[in-house]
Amino acid sequence: MPVLFRVKVIPLVLLLAMIFAFLLNWPILLHFYEILSHLEHVKIGFVISITFVLVAALNVVFMPFSVRFLLKPFFALLFITGSLVSYSTLKYKVMFDQTMIQNIIETNPQEAHSYLNGSIIIWFVFTGILPAILLFSIKIQYPEKWYKGIAYRLLSVLASLSLIAGVAALYYQDYASVGRNNSTLNKEIIPANYAYSTFQYVKDTYFTTKVPFQTLGNDAKRVVAHEKPTLMFLVIGETARSQNFSMNGYSRDTNAFTSKSGGVISFKNMHSCGTATAISVPCMFSNMNRTEYDSKKASNSENFLDIVQKTGVSLLWKENDGGCKGVCSRIPTVEIKPSDNPKLCDGKTCHDEVMLENLDDEIAKMPGDKLVAFHIIGSHGPTYYLRYPAEHRHFMPECARSDIENCTQEQLVNTYDNTLRYTDYVLAEMIEKLKNYSDQYNTVLLYVSDHGESLGESGLYLHGTPYKLAPDQQTHIPMQVWMSPGFIAGKHINMSCLENNAAKKSYSHDNLFSSILGLWDVSTSVYNPDRDLFRECRG
């Protein structure tokens, strides 16, 4: 590659620190000055010092990587990865903690493709690709003597530390006050945020002691006292938030179909275990509650599906959302392939109606009592407009693009509400199918979303915000239950009691494990009656 110019290594590292500070860390600078704009008394010297401290800190962090043969590939990689992180932070206010790194690593190609748009490509080219290419086009001059190289680097680091110390002496109270009231700021510095989170994820995933696989409910027994077998549909939703459910008080009729099904109960105060699928799905199926949840333990442990299966129930998992996060690994699974159904699929993803295809044949092949779990794509963003067919474009105008921050709020909400309305249509179709089976089975449907979604409130989009910082839109989720008269009678359920509890009491994914076991009348030591949200209403 031709050499464009020559530069000494120490000034180059300082220049790189400045580029990262002013370009890729533009989101945190904006956040910092947004915070300061709401304070009554701000010292001008403190404001000016922020960028100097950021440059100095990055210079200290970067200096150890300024050695020959490492500098260019290392910083080229930082430019490329930092560019994507910077864009996501700037546009969606995404926070790159360990959970977000897990989400990225577990993302499938179809999901990753949905985030591509003109804006991110332009940003990536100018802040990631071009700087990386330019870096390889310069001639770096290193000190001839190794000890001079060490001495110059130490002097540069000491100068940066001295500047930081000087600023701290003058404005420590100001930094402490802002930091104390805005605890996420230190997690927004690029590349330290995602580099540290990636290190933690790799360490915890690949370099910690392997957790022995734990079986659950080996003592499980089920009392079968009904003439008819049971058929349960368990529907795991994607990215639906309670706030936009008309059954929960939303002004728009997003539950236009299930509201006409008759007997559908909506749980108005349901909360998720996490703010991302990678956490919420394994957590809701596990016997751990949210505060004690451990991903490693969950991935090396059985869940309530395994326990129900041990009691003789036939299980089937139908997957339309890119993967079950390990919860279906020990039960029969049907993976929906877009290539198999061009009518309901676009080659990459499928509309959730596809879950009803071949369902009757699949049920017929399952002996005895049956549980069919559906993992739907639901309201998966940012390409909300691809989640429903043309005939379900009810709320208009829609946001037919993936860079949703460039749509109007009306367009964005319209499109998201269309996804909920379409999911509601699919659920109503499932309920109708269960009604048709009610002569052969006692039937029941339970629908619950994995997490919610932000639609631009407070500048936040999508989901994945750390739970303790997440807004209600990302954690307050819908759950619906429908039961056939035969199921209600067989389980001795007081529906008035259940409706009252669903309207007034608060529940969460923590309740799902024991509630499902309870509905199946499973007796086991891991069943917790206090977490069974149906128990209080059973005679």
Task: Please state what every model-predicted region is.
Residues M1-K187:
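Transmembrane and membrane-interface helices of multi-pass
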Residues I189, E357-D361, C399-T443, V481, ...:
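A long, amphipathic alpha-helix that forms part
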Residues A220-R222, L462-A470, E499-N501:
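Short, P/G- and charge-enriched loop/turn segments at secondary-structure junctions
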Residues G237-T239, T311, T423-V426, M430-K433, ...:
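Conserved beta-strand->loop/alpha-helix structural units within folded catalytic cores of enzymes
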Residues G249-D253, D439-N442, L446-H492, Y527-P529:
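Histidine-centered active-site microenvironments of extracellular/periplasmic hydrolases
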Residues M288-R290, Q411-L412, N494-N500:
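Flexible glycine/proline-enriched surface loops and loop-helix/loop-strand junctions
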